[in-house]
């Protein structure tokens, strides 16, 4: 249901999306972008540091991360996908050029079973306090509601319910998870403490919050880069700016382009 809703919105919009092309995964990025365009998800422009052999429009720049974000700032595209450009440099350019103080992202993941769910935090510097996780929860729910989905939120911790008392550190993660879920419920969100049982949470919740950014990043890598799951992109939340982050080692650039196009408001195909 989640992915079908996103695809339908992307096909309706067919928005103008710019995609970053890094040297390490250039061929894969171009192939995915061409498939996204062929499928009608978006009108794609490729941005890289070297000339590209592609059927799509291209922009070549010595600083492709800067050029990518400038296209968005200048209104020449409706949204951007980081693609295979470096994370740190592209996020720095995004913050500087678009005037953002901080970056919050929520990933869409597919489990090996085929079940889709949104997941955060995925950045190692995100989600380290109760307030951070509540903010990610609230803003992530707003994003998900844009696709006509009312999500249930599962807040993970470091242990099963019966593990309380075994470790002060584990106890704190459980206390934090309870506090986050309670705060989200006050705001009208269906949220529960889901303990450490990620494997069960995937089947019960549309949106899952990890204990912190390092845990979230490790879980993403274990599921999508080592296991048989897949990442479909991590859009910004808390802003109308359409920017979808990706993992250079991932395979989901076509999906991230679809996600970006679906998030654009007021676009006609």
Regions found by a protein language model. Give the residues of each.
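Anion-binding alpha/beta catalytic cores of soluble intermediary-metabolism enzymes, centered on
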Residues: 1-201, 206, 215-269
């Amino acid at each position: 249901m989640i992915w079908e809703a996103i695809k339908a919105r992307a096909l309706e919009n067919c928005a103008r999306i710019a995609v970053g092309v890094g040297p390490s995964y250039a061929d894969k990025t171009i192939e995915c972008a061409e498939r996204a365009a062929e499928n009608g998800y978006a009108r794609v422009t490729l941005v890289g540091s070297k000339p590209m052999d592609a059927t799509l429009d291209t922009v070549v720049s010595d600083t492709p991360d800067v050029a990518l974000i400038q296209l968005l700032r200048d209104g020449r595209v409706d949204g951007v996908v980081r693609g295979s450009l470096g994370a740190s440099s592209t996020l720095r350019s995004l913050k500087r050029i678009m005037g953002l103080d901080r970056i919050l992202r929520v990933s869409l993941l597919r489990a090996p079973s085929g079940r889709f769910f949104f997941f955060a935090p995925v950045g190692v510097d995100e989600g380290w306090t109760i307030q951070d996780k509540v903010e990610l929860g609230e803003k992530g729910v707003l994003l998900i509601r844009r696709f006509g989905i009312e999500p249930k939120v599962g807040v993970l911790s470091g242990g099963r319910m019966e593990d309380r008392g075994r470790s002060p550190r584990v106890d704190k993660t459980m206390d934090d998870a309870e506090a986050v879920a309670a705060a989200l419920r006050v705001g009208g969100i269906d949220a529960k403490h889901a303990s450490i049982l990620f494997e069960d949470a995937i089947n019960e919740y549309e949106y899952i919050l990890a204990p912190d950014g390092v845990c979230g990043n490790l879980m993403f890598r274990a599921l999508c880069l080592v296991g048989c799951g897949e990442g479909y992109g991590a859009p910004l939340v808390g802003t109308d700016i359409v920017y979808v982050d990706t993992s250079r080692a991932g395979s989901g650039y076509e999906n991230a382009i679809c996600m970006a196009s679906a998030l654009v408001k007021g676009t006609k195909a």
